[in-house]
Amino acid sequence: MISEIQQRYQAVRARITQAALQASRNPDDVQLLAVSKTFAAEQVREVAALGQRDFGENYVQEGVDKIAVLKDVPGLVWHCIGPLQSNKTRPVAEHFDWVHSVDRLKIAQRLSEQRPAHLPPLNICLQVNIDGGSTKAGVSPTDALALARAVSVLPRLVLRGLMTIPDPV
């Protein structure tokens, strides 16, 4: 019998396939980032067994704990997608593959300094507050280019793009 989590995952994959085909795209070119916060490590393992490899965590310690439990699963890619405070940069630098919420040079510098030399550079996205909402984190659009330039020279980071959260329509 198929579990609820398997059904949900397969339904999302089916929607991605349908949307990709409608847009004349190859569904295999669409990457799903499964947000695994609040799900147990064994549920993540179940979805990984279906082929999912990229998982996003909002909470650093919860993510670090899951990464440790699931280290026997090959090919998992871990994304830190939540806000990042400077006192949490070390475990992120040591355990995650991606950070989607870099909004200050200080955070980027700490991540670069704390990234172990035996690991590949940490992939990062700059979080940009595109609508100026005071409740949202992120660098302002006017300061984003300067931050990108400063981050792009840090030796243990690779700037991959931007992360934005628009106001709901």
What feature does the model see in each segment?
Residues 1-169:
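Conserved alpha/beta-domain cores
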